[in-house]
Design a protein with these regions (language model features):
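Active-site hotspot residues in diverse enzymes, especially metal/ion-binding acidic/histidine motifs
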Residues: 1-86
Length: 86
């Protein structure tokens, strides 16, 4: 995927959610978010459980990093679901 295509995808997500907040975007695209307090090293994990997409985010991170990790997990959801389903 080209950088231009990634940029367009991001702009489409923002327009559809009417927000740049990755948590609102996740809600708009059906990605469930769960904060996890007992992650020690991991910042976030994306997985599909019973056909429902989930992003688990380390609750010990500061708010800025939580937003970054959420956006990263949205990328997994939109671009790499095929790898998770294997």
């Amino acid at each position: 995927m080209t950088l231009q295509r990634l940029y367009r995808l991001g702009e489409e997500l923002v327009a559809n959610a009417n927000s740049r907040d990755p948590f609102q975007i996740a809600d708009e695209i059906g990605l469930q978010i769960q904060m996890v307090k007992d992650f020690t090293v991991l910042k976030g994990v994306y997985m599909i459980l019973h056909e429902v997409p989930w992003a688990f985010i380390n609750d010990n991170l500061d708010d800025r990093m939580k937003r970054i990790v959420c956006a990263h997990e949205i990328g997994h959801h939109l671009l790499h679901q095929d790898l998770v389903r294997q």
